[in-house]
């Protein structure tokens, strides 16, 4: 196959490990209960090559996201390979990041470096590409290399190199349609600006999906400092905060249950969110802003979850990832999770603080 040969030569000629996303075509027969009528299956696939050009790993995507011409891996796959620099690499693709198998790579297969290819569709609050990428790396405590496609008209962008609890080492989130090469030294612990220096920081337009939060418990912040608590059933979200002045409309949101994904499946979730909201026709939180000028001197978001699969996101003005040395995330053995802005923290306006948990066992398909 010319494509695989070209990728193999690229890895060998440059003496690098190479992971690429391709479509894999496989014949099947009647003994396979999921075999299509044309006896051919197509898989969203990542392939990995060693420095000498050898194909060392192949992964078929487990969890499809509106990919009608693709087949999911059956049974679920775990693609892992070892490197000559001491890392054990685990592969997953895009939507997989929201499911248990991507974390089981770490828990059950001892992966020390995640590699993710992606065609992501941004959704606010919280579920936008680089926010999700960083959250996975923090939750699992290992580095992640994430490469995302640029399709501006679909709200698809965002790539990064993340170092677990240390946060991003280099990331890009710029709707400019340009390909970029991100480089980082995972062993470097010095504090550097992780944003790709060619990014457009204040774009004229973004394409974002705004989540319907009409079924969330919600409470607007009225004062510039104080404590707030909102509950959705037995699940409660607490906030303690101080700001010189609230220049933006912030709403505290809580949700326990299911969230609809593209009208074809529902994911089990628990969400605790502080976000800048826009009211439309009397609806408290219809749209989510990408701009904030409110600077908090204190911010602590806390919730007691029923699972330990909790993922944190803290975003500043224009959805920039708030520098990780400005905030911390902690989870106790009782699944009480806290996101805290450190003293003398961020100089930028805080846009969203999100703690979202996944209840994998509650997931279900609608059709």
Predicted features, each with a name:
Residues 1-52, 120-143, 149-153, 265-272, ...:
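Cys-nucleophile CN-hydrolase/nitrilase-fold catalytic domain and related Cys-dependent amidase chemistry
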Residues 149-367:
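C-terminal beta-strand edge segments of enzyme domains
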Residues 2-16, 24-112, 118-135, 155-156, ...:
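Active-site catalytic loop in hydrolytic enzyme cores
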């Amino acid at each position: 196959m010319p494509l695989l040969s070209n990728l193999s030569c690229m890895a060998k000629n440059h003496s690098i490990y190479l992971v690429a996303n391709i479509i894999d075509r496989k014949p099947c027969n009647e003994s396979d209960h999921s075999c299509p009528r044309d006896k051919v299956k197509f898989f969203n696939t990542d392939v990995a090559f060693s420095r000498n050009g050898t194909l060392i790993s192949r992964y078929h995507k487990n969890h499809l996201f509106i990919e009608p011409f693709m087949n999911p891996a059956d049974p679920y796959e775990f693609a892992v390979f070892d490197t000559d620099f001491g890392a054990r690499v685990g592969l997953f693709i895009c939507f997989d990041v929201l499911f248990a198998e991507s974390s089981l790579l770490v828990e059950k297969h001892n992966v020390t470096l995640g590699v993710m290819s992606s065609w992501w569709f941004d959704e606010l609050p919280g579920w936008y590409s680089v926010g999700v990428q960083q959250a996975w790396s923090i939750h699992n405590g290992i580095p992640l290399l994430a490469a995302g496609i640029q399709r501006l008209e679909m709200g698809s962008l965002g790539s990064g190199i993340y170092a677990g609890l240390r946060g991003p080492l280099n990331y890009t989130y710029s709707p400019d349609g340009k390909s970029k090469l991100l480089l980082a030294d995972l062993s470097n612990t010095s504090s550097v600006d992780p944003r790709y220096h060619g990014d457009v920081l204040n774009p004229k337009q973004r394409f974002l999906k705004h989540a319907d939060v009409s079924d969330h418990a919600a409470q607007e912040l009225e004062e510039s400092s104080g404590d707030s608590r909102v509950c959705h059933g037995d699940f409660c979200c607490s906030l303690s905060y101080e700001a010189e002045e609230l220049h933006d409309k912030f709403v505290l949101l809580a949700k326990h249950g299911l969230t609809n994904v593209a009208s074809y499946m529902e994911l089990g979730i628990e969400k605790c969110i502080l976000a800048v909201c826009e009211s439309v026709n009397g609806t408290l939180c219809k749209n989510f802003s990408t701009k904030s000028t409110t600077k908090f001197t204190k911010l602590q978001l806390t919730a007691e979850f029923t699972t330990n699969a909790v993922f944190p996101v803290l975003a500043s003005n224009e959805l920039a990832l708030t520098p990780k040395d400005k905030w911390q995330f902690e989870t106790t053995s009782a699944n009480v999770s806290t996101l805290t802005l450190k003293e003398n923290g961020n100089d930028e306006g805080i846009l969203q603080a999100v703690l979202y948990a996944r209840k994998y066992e509650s997931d279900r398909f609608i059709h």
